[in-house]
């Protein structure tokens, strides 16, 4: 039979590690780039856009669709990096236990 006090200590330790991982993620920035760095987006660990940089060559009406696509690609690039880091941080906090598919840190 598992010692309940030991189980409780492990759960508290895991909870503390998860909180630390969430705080670290919230303070981390992720950069997504598209079009050979014509568009760059920086997001927070919470997935919020912090900065958008657009090369002046794209600021023409005839480049509108290209710019829209590049913004989408840059954001998705940054978000993917954030999601991967989030999964790695959470997995580390859980002492290497595997996570169910689609499970994410609750931000």
UniProtKB/Swiss-Prot annotation:
It comes from the Bacteria. Pfam families: YbaB_DNA_bd. Keywords: Cytoplasm, DNA-binding. It is found in: Cytoplasm, Nucleoid. Gene3D superfamilies: Nucleoid-associated protein YbaB-like domain (3.30.1310.10). The keyword Acetylation does not apply. Its main location: cytoplasm. GO terms for molecular function: DNA binding. GO terms for cellular component: bacterial nucleoid; cytosol. The keyword Endoplasmic reticulum does not apply. Belongs to the YbaB/EbfC family. Binds to DNA and alters its conformation. May be involved in regulation of gene expression, nucleoid organization and DNA protection. Homodimer. This is Nucleoid-associated protein RT0857. It comes from Rickettsia typhi (strain ATCC VR-144 / Wilmington). The lineage of its organism: Bacteria, Pseudomonadati, Pseudomonadota, Alphaproteobacteria, Rickettsiales.
């Amino acid at each position: 039979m598992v010692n309940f006090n030991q189980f409780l200590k492990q759960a508290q330790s895991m909870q503390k590690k998860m909180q630390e991982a969430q705080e670290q993620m919230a303070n981390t920035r992720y950069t997504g780039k598209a079009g050979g760095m014509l568009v760059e987006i920086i997001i927070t660990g919470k997935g919020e856009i912090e900065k958008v940089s657009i090369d002046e060559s794209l600021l023409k009406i005839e480049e509108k669709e290209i710019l829209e696509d590049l913004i989408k690609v840059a954001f998705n690039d940054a978000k993917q990096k954030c999601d991967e880091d989030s999964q790695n941080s959470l997995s580390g906090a859980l002492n290497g236990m595997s996570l169910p598919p689609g499970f994410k840190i609750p931000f």
